[in-house]
Regions:
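A hydrophobic alpha-helix adjacent to the NAD(P)-binding/active-site core of NAD(P)-dependent oxidoreductases
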Residues: 1
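Active-site helix of classical SDR
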Residues: 13, 49
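A short helix-coil junction within the Rossmann-fold of NAD(P)-dependent oxidoreductases
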Residues: 15-24
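Residue(s) in the substrate-gating loop at a strand-loop-helix junction
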Residues: 33
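Active-site-adjacent segment of SDR/Rossmann-fold oxidoreductases
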Residues: 38, 59-69
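Active-site loop immediately N-terminal to the catalytic Tyr-X3-Lys motif
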Residues: 38-44
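C-terminal helical subdomain
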Residues: 69, 73-74, 81, 93-137
């Protein structure tokens, strides 16, 4: 999880940042999670990686202002993705699968959040969007 959720974000930033700085424009969209705001049982490491994405993004936001680069973190609740299939512990995977079957919203909901952040005027920086399915308590 650390390699994908934390190092992957860092590598993506490192690859794109020089190009955005040259253009004096750009927009990073980093993916966190509701888990980055609230830790639940059996997901401390996942929550830690998603919290790291939020913290890295906030630091990046402050550092890239001279180049007119925007930074948005999308923290979502349950979205219909492959996440439930990536859990290796059978009991936890079963629980997550049932949770997602009950609560997950379509991936299009996530796409609309991204489109909202990107469609703002150049002088507006939507720093964070936190959304959940209406029925999701966590």
């Amino acid at each position: 999880m650390i390699d994908v959720h934390v190092k992957g974000v860092l590598y993506g930033i490192a690859a794109a940042l020089p190009h955005m700085q040259r253009r004096k424009a750009g927009h990073f969209i980093n993916v966190s999670s509701v888990a980055g705001h609230k830790v639940g049982v059996n997901n401390a490491v996942y929550a830690a990686t998603k919290t790291a994405v939020r913290v890295l993004s906030e630091g990046l936001r402050q550092e890239v202002k001279p180049w007119n680069i925007r930074t948005t973190v999308i923290s979502s609740g349950a979205v219909a993705t492959e996440l439930p299939n990536s859990v290796s512990e059978p009991d936890i995977a079963r629980g997550i699968g049932q949770f997602y079957e009950t609560y997950a919203v379509p991936a299009d909901s996530f796409a609309r959040a991204v489109a909202f952040a990107m469609s703002q005027p150049e002088d507006v920086d939507i720093n964070e969007i936190l959304f959940r399915p209406t029925r999701q308590a966590l």
